[in-house]
Curated annotation (Swiss-Prot):
It comes from Tupiella akineta. This is Large ribosomal subunit protein bL36c. NCBIfam families: rpmJ_bact. GO terms for biological process: translation. GO terms for cellular component: chloroplast; ribonucleoprotein complex; ribosome. The lineage of its organism: Eukaryota, Viridiplantae, Chlorophyta, Ulvophyceae, OUU clade. InterPro entries: Ribosomal_bL36, Ribosomal_bL36_sp. Belongs to the bacterial ribosomal protein bL36 family.
Amino acid sequence: MKVRPSVRKICENCRLIRRKRKILVICTNPKHKQRQG
């Protein structure tokens, strides 16, 4: 899980999800997991 000031999709399988005011990126590739905060 990478914590970044700006999250974005890295590949086609990445999905942006908003959960409890946090923006997450969930992907089939575990390296692409990101969280904003």
